[in-house]
């Protein structure tokens, strides 16, 4: 609320005016100190705060607190983790953290099958500002000494005594100091393979002019690795030694040069307290990576915004100076084995649901996880739609030579759209249905939806559905009851909103008094046949016209 002043938004001259604006808008809670400010409290005592608005937000807040028994069960006492759950940092919990980190790691490159590495290599160089500085992510609670295990410590624990591990930071995360890059280059030149850990700094206690690169209020204008990290990467790659890049980050970075220079690339994100051992598990083949990208990695910052599910355009899909296609697309990720897809089956059921099945086979030499992803493309619709949309996915584990059937069921809501009236509807028509291990290709410069699909069965399978059902929501409004409040000069009007249509949809109910919006806007989500009762408060002596609206319908009372 304090941001309404000159601190940010300039809609209020001081905190008192900001508090009045917030109370008028029904803001009951404050992330900050405006409502606790001594001047604001004194202003309330002096009558400079609108007491009607203050009463309204207090009523809302107290009702919520009573409903949740917050006065009987105070949740605001200082927390003692050992009393709440004595085993919170037990071996079992650490193993769970390690498994979660393993499952999330994404392998982007593995040229010449460099990975997995041998645990009997003579010398490994572990370089970079993140190598011995695991990043936990923004808003991480205070950690115990030794709780965070770095990639360096994970590698040292994984290899045998005969393997020498060399470590050099090379540079820090963000400063322009490059004086230690030659030390890293020397270590790389003495090694059989280089593991570089580069990326983000999320630590709030960053010092020595090292800034956070991610988290709240930390934005970067480019996607180049911060500080001297890109220079460090290029200098080390110039030694000719095979380089494994581990991107420790919570965002995409520009990895175009890295993809050309490095033999292998892993993204271990901000991997939690067991991130180092988990990364080592993948590096040395104790765990076969099966993570998939939850975001698109562009070739260049100039491609942004870049989403897998972009809407069709009135122009061609190309750049003059580079490919339109991203470097690594949404849902992408490699494995130490290979998979093939076949036998796509698509069936529309009598209730409008769509059954989709496909067979996935492990055609490689080791066991591994595959993430089978279901995408659809609405080929022709009454409004512009996205070129593809992810609708479901499942992660399966397959032994070498093993096949499994993956099955998905789409509901009408899954293939619905918002029409030109912003109503959610399902339209008849042609849909492209795709199941694969990554998001589908889209390589055309024009007629983009026609090009969406998989080029071979190692990526996925594609089929067509001629959908024959139509669905839509329809809402009714009615006054359910009116209650007189015995403790104040108000009455409560209970409004019934019901979905009498055939599709789940969302909406909002608004109250107008004398043609002006009054009270809170209440949002709802209703399935077919579902009804919700919504209370609105009115003064008992109100003699002005009152009406309620939702979805182009008005109910005067």
Can you describe what each PLM-predicted range is?
Residues 4-8, 38-49, 63, 87, ...:
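C-terminal non-catalytic regions of proteins with extracellular/luminal or membrane-system context
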Residues 1-32, 38-39, 45-53, 60:
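Second-shell residues forming the walls of enzyme active-site clefts
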Residues 59, 63-86:
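Conserved, charged catalytic cores of large soluble enzymes
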Residues 34-35, 56-57, 72-79, 116-119, ...:
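Short coil/turn segments at secondary-structure boundaries
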């Amino acid at each position: 609320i304090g941001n309404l002043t000159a601190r940010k938004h300039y809609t209020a001259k001081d905190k008192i005016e900001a508090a009045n604006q917030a109370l008028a808008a029904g803001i009951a809670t404050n992330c900050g100190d405006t409502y606790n400010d001594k001047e604001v409290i004194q202003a309330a005592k002096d009558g400079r705060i609108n007491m009607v608005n203050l009463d309204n937000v207090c009523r809302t807040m107290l009702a919520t607190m009573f409903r949740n028994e917050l006065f009987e069960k105070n949740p605001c006492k200082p927390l003692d983790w050992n009393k709440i759950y004595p085993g919170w940092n037990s071996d079992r919990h650490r193993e769970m953290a390690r498994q979660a980190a393993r499952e999330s790691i994404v392998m982007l490159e593995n040229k010449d099958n460099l990975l997995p590495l041998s645990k009997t290599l003579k010398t490994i160089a572990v370089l970079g500002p993140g190598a011995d500085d695991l990043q936990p992510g923004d808003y991480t609670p205070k950690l115990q000494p030794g709780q965070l295990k770095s990639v360096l410590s994970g590698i040292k624990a994984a290899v045998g005594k005969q393997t020498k591990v060399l470590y050099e930071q090379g540079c820090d995360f963000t400063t322009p100091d490059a004086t230690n890059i030659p030390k890293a280059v020397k270590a790389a030149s003495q090694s059989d393979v280089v593991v570089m850990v580069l990326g983000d700094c999320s630590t709030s206690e960053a010092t020595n002019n090292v800034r956070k690169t991610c988290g709240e209020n930390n934005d970067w204008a480019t996607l180049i690795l911060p500080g001297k990290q890109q220079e460090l990467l290029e200098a080390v790659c110039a030694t000719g030694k095979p380089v494994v890049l581990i991107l420790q980050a919570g965002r995409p970075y520009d990895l175009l040069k890295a993809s050309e220079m490095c033999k292998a690339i892993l993204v271990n994100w901000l991997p939690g307290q067991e991130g180092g051992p988990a990364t080592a598990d993948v590096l040395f083949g104790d765990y076969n990576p099966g993570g998939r990208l939850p975001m698109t990695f562009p070739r260049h910052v100039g491609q942004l915004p870049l989403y897998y599910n972009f809407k069709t355009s009135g122009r061609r899909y190309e750049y003059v100076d580079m490919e339109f296609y991203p470097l690594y697309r949404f849902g992408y990720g490699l494995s130490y084995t290979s998979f093939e897809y076949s036998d796509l089956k698509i069936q529309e059921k009598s209730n409008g649901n769509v059954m989709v099945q496909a067979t996935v086979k492990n055609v490689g030499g080791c066991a591994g996880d595959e993430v089978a992803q279901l995408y659809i493309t609405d080929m022709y619709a009454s409004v512009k739609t996205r070129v593809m949309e992810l609708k479901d996915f499942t992660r399966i584990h397959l032994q070498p030579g093993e096949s499994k059937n993956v099955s998905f069921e789409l509901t009408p809501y899954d293939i619905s759209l918002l029409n030109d009236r912003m109503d959610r509807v399902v339209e008849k028509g042609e849909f492209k249905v795709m199941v694969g291990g990554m998001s589908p290709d889209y390589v055309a410069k024009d007629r983009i939806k026609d090009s969406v699909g998989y080029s071979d069965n190692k990526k996925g399978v594609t089929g067509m559905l001629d959908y024959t059902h139509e669905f839509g929501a329809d809402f009714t409004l009615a006054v359910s009851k009116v209650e007189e409040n015995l403790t104040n000069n108000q009455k409560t009007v209970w409004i019934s909103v019901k979905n009498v249509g055939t599709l789940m949809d969302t909406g909002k109910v608004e109250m107008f008094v004398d043609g002006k919006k009054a009270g809170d806007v209440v949002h709802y989500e209703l399935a077919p046949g579902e009804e919700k009762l919504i209370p609105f408060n009115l003064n008992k002596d109100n003699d002005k016209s009152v009406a309620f609206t939702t979805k182009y319908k008005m109910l005067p009372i």
